[in-house]
């Protein structure tokens, strides 16, 4: 039995649910409960004009297969619907968050949590989630009894949500676009990468983040594409990839109100675009709605993004505006302010990594990344499959 009305709590009878649906419900409840504790600066507002803002919520959870009172542990939660223009990266030096969509921020947050746990790892007492091997320097593994899940309050942008968009838009919402219409492409010579939601009838192509056609282009790829790539390469970023003995993958993605047809399109997008995928994601439904999602046509996307990280014995949260900590943004014609970077930024993660592996002090982030030949070859191979016409990268963003 489910009772959901507007923004009121949703009462769900977990006892009558299949086990996987029950797991999806439990994960969503934990993530939303943590969201409700965020400071008001980290959440959407009612603007002075009376217009209501909305946002997307995501969270990374660790599930203990052995069960127990702490079966589900939240690693990170994040909100956000924004991606910055590619041009912003020319002054970034790793300090600006280019992609502030919730699920990408949540995964960045989980990587920061893992880096923090490795930095504070004590071999004598160990760690709840990770264990080290006997190598020197030691490398780590996620303990076998833990699995990772990603909760997202709505379908990820890009290919995985195109069928839903097609089924739910009005006939006059979008102009009809033919494959020969060149304005839909970021680069007319690369017809396997489309801009945003243009030509939404077309499937199995890479898309940039959605945005107004007259806005400065972001070049950041859709969440569907990024999540799919991580399911072949690992949810670990290049820094944790170096520190872990084996890659780590998502076991579940939890999305509210997943009807059978929508779930089928999700599985088609995630399971067939990359052949022979050994680590297929299971998509779990949940009934509990996210109360700060879009509820009315007049609601507008929230300007603020946020991230909250759950470390070993404390949590920390940040409000993020225009890719930097709230209150630190400067116009693109000016240099960035000191300490503007988020704790999940490339700059902050690189600084943390060098404390763990001081032998990398003195080289840049991109130089370090270029040395990961096996990982680089894998990612290139994935890109070649997803976009046979070629890849359009974002601007270089290095940290010295």
From Swiss-Prot:
Residues recorded as binding 1D-myo-inositol hexakisphosphate, renumbered to this chain, are 108, 226, 232, 369, 375
Q: What is its EC number?
A: 3.5.4.34
GO molecular function terms noted in the UniProt entry: metal ion binding; RNA binding; tRNA-specific adenosine deaminase activity; tRNA-specific adenosine-37 deaminase activity
| Membership in a protein family | Belongs to the ADAT1 family.
Q: Name one GO biological process term.
A: tRNA wobble adenosine to inosine editing
Secretion signal, residue range per the UniProt entry: none
Residues in A to I editase domain copies: 76-400
Function description: Deaminates adenosine-37 to inosine in tRNA-Ala.
Q: Keyword Oxidoreductase, does the record have it?
A: no
- Active site at 103 (proton donor)
Which keywords does UniProt give here? Answer: Hydrolase, Metal-binding, tRNA processing, Zinc
Coiled-coil region(s): none
Name the domain of life: Eukaryota
Q: Name one GO cellular component term.
A: nucleus
Reaction equation(s) it catalyzes: adenosine(37) in tRNA(Ala) + H2O + H(+) = inosine(37) in tRNA(Ala) + NH4(+)
**How, per the record, is the cofactor bound?**
Binds 1 myo-inositol hexakisphosphate (IP6) per subunit.
Required co-factor(s) are:
1D-myo-inositol hexakisphosphate; Zn(2+)
Name the chain's protein.
Answer: tRNA-specific adenosine deaminase 1
Give the originating organism: Saccharomyces cerevisiae (strain ATCC 204508 / S288c) (Baker's yeast)
Keyword tRNA processing appears in the UniProt entry: yes
Binding-site list for Zn(2+): 101, 157, 223
By its UniProt entry, which InterPro entries does this protein fall under?
Answer: A_deamin, Tad1
């Amino acid at each position: 039995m489910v009772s959901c009305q507007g923004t009121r709590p949703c009462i769900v009878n977990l006892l009558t649910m299949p086990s996987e649906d029950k797991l999806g419900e439990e994960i969503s409840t934990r993530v939303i409960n943590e969201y409700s504790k965020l400071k008001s600066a980290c959440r959407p507002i009612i603007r002075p004009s009376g217009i209501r803002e909305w946002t997307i919520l995501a969270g990374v959870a660790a599930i203990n297969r052995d069960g127990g009172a702490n079966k589900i542990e939240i690693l990170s939660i994040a909100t956000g619907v924004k991606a910055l223009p590619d041009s912003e990266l020319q002054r970034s030096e790793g300090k600006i968050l280019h992609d502030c969509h919730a699920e990408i921020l949540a995964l960045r947050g989980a990587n920061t949590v893992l880096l923090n746990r490795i930095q504070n790892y004590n071999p004598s007492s160990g760690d709840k989630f990770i264990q080290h091997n006997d190598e020197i320097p030691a490398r780590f593994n996620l303990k076998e009894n833990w699995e990772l899940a990603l909760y997202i309050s709505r379908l990820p942008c890009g290919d995985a949500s195109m069928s839903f968009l097609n089924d739910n838009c009005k006939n006059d919402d979008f102009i009809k676009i033919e494959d020969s219409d060149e304005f839909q492409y970021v680069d007319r010579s690369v017809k396997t990468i489309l801009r945003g939601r243009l030509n939404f009838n077309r499937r199995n192509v890479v898309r940039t983040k959605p945005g107004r056609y007259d806005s400065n282009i972001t070049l950041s790829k859709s969440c569907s594409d990024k999540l799919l790539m991580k399911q072949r390469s690992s949810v670990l970023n290049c820094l944790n990839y170096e520190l872990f003995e084996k890659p780590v993958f998502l076991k579940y993605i939890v999305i509210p109100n997943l009807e059978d047809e929508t779930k089928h399109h999700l599985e088609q997008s995630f399971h067939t675009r990359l052949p022979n995928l050994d680590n297929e994601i299971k998509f779990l439904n949940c009934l509990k709605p996210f109360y700060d999602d879009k509820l009315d046509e007049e609601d507008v996307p929230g300007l603020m993004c946020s991230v909250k990280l759950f470390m070993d014995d404390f949590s920390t949260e940040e409000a993020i505006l225009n890719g930097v900590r709230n209150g630190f943004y400067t116009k693109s014609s000016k240099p960035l302010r000191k300490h503007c970077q988020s704790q999940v930024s490339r700059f902050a993660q690189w600084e943390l990594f060098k404390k763990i592996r001081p032998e990398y002090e003195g080289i840049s982030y991109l130089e370090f990344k270029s040395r990961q030949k096996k990982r680089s070859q894998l990612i290139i191979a994935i890109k070649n499959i997803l976009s046979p016409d070629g890849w359009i990268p974002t601007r270089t963003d290095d940290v010295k």
